[in-house]
Amino acid sequence: GGLISGIACAAKQINPSVKIVGVEPEGAASALAAVEDDQLVKLSEVSTIADGTAVKQIGETPFEYIKKYVDEIVTVSDYELMEAFLLLVEKHKLIAEGSGILSLAALKKLHCKRKKVVSLISGGNMDVMTISSMINKGLISRGRILTFSVQLPDIPGQLEVVSHLLNECNANVIGVE
């Protein structure tokens, strides 16, 4: 809540008519819950790949700033975050953590065509295993990678049969375990 609080306060001081939209992960929407109830709310659990925003309760000071300066809060799913991550990596050759791409993931929901929009992308606090996992999950969700298991009889040539079937489907084998 601290990042949007500061940005919203500064932006509204410069231009009071600017629209400020906050974005939270669906699995950790503590600010949205607080705004809807007009009081701090402690979520029973949080579950999101955006670990930097995975808080059960927003802080009191950010909550006050959000009530005063933020016009709307939307949520995005972990799937939408993975899609945004993959877009950022493939099209722009950039890496940002899940919490840092919430605004990018929300752009499709906000109907921003032909509008001046600032989407803040921040934070590169990710280890290589998380990066690899996010890329693989994104490719799987887009149908670009398929993972499957098959039990083959212990007869010579069976792997060749599977390889031939994959070739007929114009598929590529990335790895065999």
Where on the chain are the PLM-derived regions?
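Short amphipathic alpha-helix segments
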Residues: 155-176
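Short secondary-structure transition/capping segments
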Residues: 18, 71-72, 166-171
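Active-site-adjacent helical/loop segments in soluble small-molecule enzymes
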Residues: 59-115, 174
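Glycine-rich phosphate/pyrophosphate-binding loop at beta-loop-alpha junctions
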Residues: 2-68, 108-114, 118-153, 163
